[in-house]
């Protein structure tokens, strides 16, 4: 940990609260924008950090995690920072080995394949001991931000984390994890409950460390039917939101259940979240109709638009903003994360277009 004083009571005053206002549904001078995976391999300065250090070492070294979190903010006028980490630090905290294979992604040498394997999972988890490095990174980053923009913390959702633990990697047919739900419903709920408890404790720890908003990533929820989502995703997502809100009602919570568009109405009525993220598979106008004014929406530009040059990006951004129907209760983002191959000019054009076009819409 740096010698720098990171006393949590001495955080600098926030200068740009546009993102937090949009989360709460308050009036804003323009639509705020941040981008999932805004710190990442598309940035040459990130590659230079990674040249000497493996992925999880960056996550586990607060000084490095802070450095890469701030990199995109030094390039683009983003309205929020998101701490550099990974959703798979939660399984690691539960004693499950996770490796990050260059060019391939996460790999679990010993996945949870049988109900007997559940006995290998460490539970309960002391999050301060196992994930304290994330908390240290948050506190350091919050101080080094100097109040420029709010700092977002995050976790993976229980179903998505369970999927990785059982499959052993991403990009599969999900046959192992989905069949678990059918073959072992009781054990599935047990595993999901364990993951949920760790996620809640982890998120509460992140708030204590300095996170000013939180996002829950359910990246694989789109693999489930509406009925299976209602049984194995929704209750745990709602539990996380409600338990965190019971302690910290002032902290905005964002839920991004990727591709589970059918769940938007239920999630918006749950009272567990302030913001729902959407991807590009739903028209913003349809999403807005489903959630009414109960929550704010976040999204939803197709990341592939960022390959296409300034004019296409601007045109598509305008279509997106117009489809949302109002600049209130809106946070601009992509429908998923940045790609490693994205040109730097892509996010630069997108952020500029969101700010300029939304100001024009508001000032009409």
From Swiss-Prot:
InterPro entries in the record, alphabetically?
UROD/MetE-like_sf, Uroporphyrinogen_deCO2ase_HemE, Uroporphyrinogen_deCOase
Q: Specify the enzyme's EC class, one word.
A: lyase
Give a GO biological-process term.
heme biosynthetic process
Record's keyword annotation contains Lyase:
yes
The places in or outside the cell where this protein is found are: Cytoplasm
Site annotation (Transition state stabilizer) points to 86
Q: Which CDD domains match?
A: URO-D
What is the name of this protein?
A: Uroporphyrinogen decarboxylase
Organism, per UniProt? Dictyostelium discoideum (Social amoeba)
Give the gene symbol.
Answer: hemE
């Amino acid at each position: 940990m740096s010698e720098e004083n990171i006393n949590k009571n001495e955080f600098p005053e926030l200068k740009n609260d546009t993102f937090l206002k949009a989360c709460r549904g308050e009036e804003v001078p323009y639509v705020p924008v941040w981008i999932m995976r805004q710190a990442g391999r598309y940035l040459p300065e990130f590659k230079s950090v990674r040249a000497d250090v493996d992925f999880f070492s960056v996550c586990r070294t607060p000084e490095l995690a802070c450095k890469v979190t701030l990199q995109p903010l030094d390039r683009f006028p983003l309205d929020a920072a998101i701490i550099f980490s990974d959703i798979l630090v939660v399984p690691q905290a539960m004693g499950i080995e996770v490796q990050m294979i260059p060019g391939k992604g996460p790999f679990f040498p010993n996945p949870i394949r049988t109900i007997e394997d559940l006995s290998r999972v460490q539970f309960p988890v002391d999050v301060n001991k196992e994930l304290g490095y994330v908390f240290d990174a948050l506190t350091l980053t919050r101080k080094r931000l100097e109040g420029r923009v709010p700092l977002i913390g995050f976790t993976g959702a229980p179903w998505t984390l369970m999927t990785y633990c059982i499959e052993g990697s991403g990009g599969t047919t999900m046959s192992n994890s989905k069949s678990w739900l059918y073959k072992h419903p009781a054990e599935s709920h047990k595993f999901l409950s364990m993951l949920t408890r760790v996620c809640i404790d982890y998120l509460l720890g992140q708030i204590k460390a300095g996170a000013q908003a939180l996002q829950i990533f359910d990246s694989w929820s789109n693999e489930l039917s509406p009925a299976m989502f209602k049984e194995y995703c929704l209750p745990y997502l709602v539990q996380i939101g409600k338990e965190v809100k019971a302690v910290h009602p002032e902290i905005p919570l964002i839920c991004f259940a990727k591709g589970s568009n059918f769940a938007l109405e239920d999630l918006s009525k749950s009272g567990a979240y302030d913001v729902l993220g959407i991807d590009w598979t739903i028209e913003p106008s349809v999403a807005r109709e489903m959630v009414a004014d109960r929550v704010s929406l976040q999204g939803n530009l197709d990341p592939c638009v960022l390959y296409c040059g300034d004019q296409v990006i601007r045109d598509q951004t305008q279509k997106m903003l117009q489809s949302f129907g109002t600049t209130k209760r809106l946070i601009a983002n992509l429908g998923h994360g940045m790609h490693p191959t994205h040109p730097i000019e892509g996010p630069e054009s997108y952020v500029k277009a969101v700010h300029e076009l939304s100001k024009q819409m508001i000032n009409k």
